[in-house]
């Protein structure tokens, strides 16, 4: 059996699946339910002194959409769109204090952790909230620099408004890190192009790690009524956003090398694996639990355990970042990889007259032959589109040899270049020889 435990910023987690800061952590009762379901941790819904952000949660609105841009009506598919408007914890901080110590003990007795989340009105209130969290014994705090809603709240400056400004994010982070001893993790907003700059700024300011990422701000329309859903802009996320979240996990892991929790894009254990392999050993699960209930949580944890056993991963560390470490650093590396071309297996092509592969090849590399589809190697650029549009799995990619590729690029190469096997050292050297001798 795989070891799901891990150390994240000095805190030991029994498994990497943490319940994100949202409605599922907005009450002591549901937090206990998360503990009982086996969560590695729970991040409390953001504690705040911003009254309007607490009031917003008391007036939350949701529009959960399917692939047809219609309300799901009880049918939760994997690619749902979670469009909603909600704020910070609807319970005042002073009312949370009596519960935090008890909940933290309840969690730790079962090998789990209650993690704080803060969203202040001023720098001093950020400090005060985090000190309260620390005084209650919580082992870690997340600063919510990612919430998309403050930008739509007149007079409110917080959430993504801080997370979009590296200098402000650095200042708040530094002040909080000076004030508390527990690890401080920053939740980043994807509503910008400077995510890496902000991550670098908070790292320099003392942050122990980052969460990549919160949700986006979106706009959705009901075309039957012509009205904006929920009346206008709202937060938007879901599994469809996973690749966007992973982009930032990849860059932060590769370029900054700091601890990351992954968020925004998890439905099942396979998504958890993607985040871990990209570089986020700890993951936050949120919207799917709101749609399927806390009882769904064990299936994610058990699925991860089974996956690791089947694929031979002994622990979380053995998976962490393996995809990012093998990723190209820039698109130029793609040009140095072996050239590929498609081949059609006529026996597998059950209906050559369907021609979908030909219709979706925009390089004239496929053509209708005598009762079959023919591949024209000289035109094929190796994009692999045909392997995905063919309904019969009749196409496959093959490596184009250096000689074949050189012949495609240089039409007047003298034969003696090939006679001495001058291309054995690789394509780039072969091309140089072809240029000289051609």
Locate the predicted segments by residue.
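N-terminal capping/small domains of soluble enzymes
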Residues: 1-127
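Alpha/beta enzyme core
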Residues: 32-37, 41, 109-110, 121-261, ...
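Short secondary-structure boundary segments
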Residues: 45-47, 145, 214, 287-288
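C-terminal helical cap(s) of enzyme catalytic domains, especially alpha/beta-barrels
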Residues: 51-71, 219-237, 288-313, 407-414
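Extended, hydrophobic interaction surfaces within ordered domains
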Residues: 250-256, 271-327, 381, 385-388
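Flanking helices and flexible, charged tails adjoining ferredoxin-like Fe-S electron-transfer domains
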Residues: 304-314, 318-334, 346-347, 351, ...
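C-terminal accessory/binding modules appended to enzymatic or scaffolding proteins
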Residues: 338-370
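Short linker/helix segments within small regulatory modules
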Residues: 369-377
């Amino acid at each position: 059996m795989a070891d799901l435990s891990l150390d994240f910023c000095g805190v030991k987690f029994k498994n990497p699946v943490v319940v994100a800061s949202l409605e599922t952590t907005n009450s002591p009762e549901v937090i206990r339910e998360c503990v009982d379901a086996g969560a590695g941790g729970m991040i409390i819904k953001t504690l705040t002194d911003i009254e309007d952000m607490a009031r917003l949660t008391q007036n939350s609105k949701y529009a959960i959409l399917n692939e047809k841009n219609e309300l799901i009506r009880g049918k939760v598919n994997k690619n749902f769109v979670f469009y909603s408007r909600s704020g910070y914890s609807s319970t005042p901080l002073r009312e949370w204090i009596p519960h935090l110590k008890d909940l933290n003990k309840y969690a730790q007795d079962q090998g789990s952790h209650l993690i704080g989340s803060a969203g202040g009105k001023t720098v001093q209130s950020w400090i005060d909230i985090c000190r309260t969290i620390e005084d209650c014994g919580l082992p870690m705090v997340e600063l919510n620099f990612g919430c998309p809603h403050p930008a739509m709240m007149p007079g409110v400056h917080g959430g993504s408004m801080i997370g979009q400004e590296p200098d402000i994010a650095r200042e708040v982070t530094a002040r909080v890190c000076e004030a508390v001893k527990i690890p401080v993790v920053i939740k980043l907003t994807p509503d910008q192009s400077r995510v890496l700059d902000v991550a670098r700024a908070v790292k320099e300011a003392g942050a122990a790690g980052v969460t990549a990422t919160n949700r986006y701000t979106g706009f959705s329309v009901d075309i039957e009524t012509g009205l904006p859903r929920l009346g206008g802009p709202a937060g938007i996320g879901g599994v469809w956003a996973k690749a966007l979240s992973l982009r930032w996990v990849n860059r932060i892991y590769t370029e900054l090398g700091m601890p990351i929790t992954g968020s925004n894009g998890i439905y099942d254990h396979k998504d958890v694996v993607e985040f871990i392999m990209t570089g986020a050993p700890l993951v936050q699960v949120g919207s799917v639990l709101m749609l399927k209930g806390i009882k769904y949580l064990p299936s994610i944890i058990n699925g991860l355990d089974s996956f690791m056993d089947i694929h031979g991963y002994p622990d979380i560390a053995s998976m962490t970042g393996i995809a990012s470490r093998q990723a190209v650093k820039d698109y130029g590396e793609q040009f140095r990889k072996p050239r590929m071309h498609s081949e059609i297996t006529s026996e597998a092509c059950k209906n050559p007259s369907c021609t979908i592969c030909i219709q979706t090849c925009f390089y004239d590399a496929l053509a209708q032959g005598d009762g079959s589809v023919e591949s024209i190697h000289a035109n094929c650029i190796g994009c692999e589109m045909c392997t995905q549009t063919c309904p019969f799995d009749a196409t496959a990619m093959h490596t184009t040899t250096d000689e074949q590729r050189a012949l495609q690029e240089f039409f007047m190469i003298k034969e003696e270049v090939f006679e001495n096997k001058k291309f054995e050292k690789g394509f780039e050297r072969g091309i140089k020889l072809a240029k000289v001798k051609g």
